[in-house]
Amino acid sequence: MQRIEAMTLADAVFPRIQTDSRYLAWARDAALMLGFAGFVAVCAQIAVRLPWTTVPVTGQTFAVLVTGGALGMWRGAGSLSIYMLMGMIGIPVLAPGAPDVTGTWGLHFILPWNGTNAFPWDISSGGYVVGFILAAALVGYLAERQWDRKPWVHLGMFMGNALLYVPGILWLAYLIGTDWVPAGASKPLGEYISGSGTWNKALEGGLYPFIVGDLMKLFLASLTLPAAWGLVARFKGKQPPDVTPQTPAD
């Protein structure tokens, strides 16, 4: 049986065989996507509540970047889509809400499980949940081109991290501009965030508080994937595979 050359870390750890049936390959990919969706859910429960924003700092960003890098573009995006759908159908996989991280400052570390569930358009952090899908797709696309084992892996992680902020900040700005009142709150979202003007508040509540933490998380993700490739190479006794397409010999 001949193995198909690895394109991503997941393919190197769980290699496909050329004799695998289509259904076996689908089952393998589905299991990987579900498993990494669970990984993101666990990391979402590592949450820090800041007093000046309704969006918590969580371990999700790290998990999203690693998921994209490990699975590749389509499976990475699929895994984060599953994660979003799990929250939409009532499974508490999203980050803890404000009532679960009490006080002006708060920390929650996985247990007891205080995850939430919601449609993305019902929560202030919904734009970021959508952004996770885009970020995983971009990082996965780059990983399929070996960026996850190159010196510029940090750049790819930064690009993915930056991309997830686009829908996140846009959605937050929309909610602030429409005087949206969060569930269980007594005043509009914008009044919980310092600053003046819709866009200034959106940046104050949805970007500035997370810059340092996200730089740390993307740096950690940048170390995790090359290290994982190194372990694979060590246990399999070879270098991380070069996935440059080869033309079959006649």
What are the residue ranges of the model-derived segments?
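Pore-lining transmembrane helices
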Residues: 60-62, 71, 75-76, 96-97, ...
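Transmembrane alpha-helical segments of multi-pass membrane transport proteins and ion-pumping complexes
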Residues: 37-45, 69, 73, 80, ...
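Short helix-perturbing small/polar motifs within transmembrane alpha-helices
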Residues: 2-22, 28, 40-42, 99-169, ...
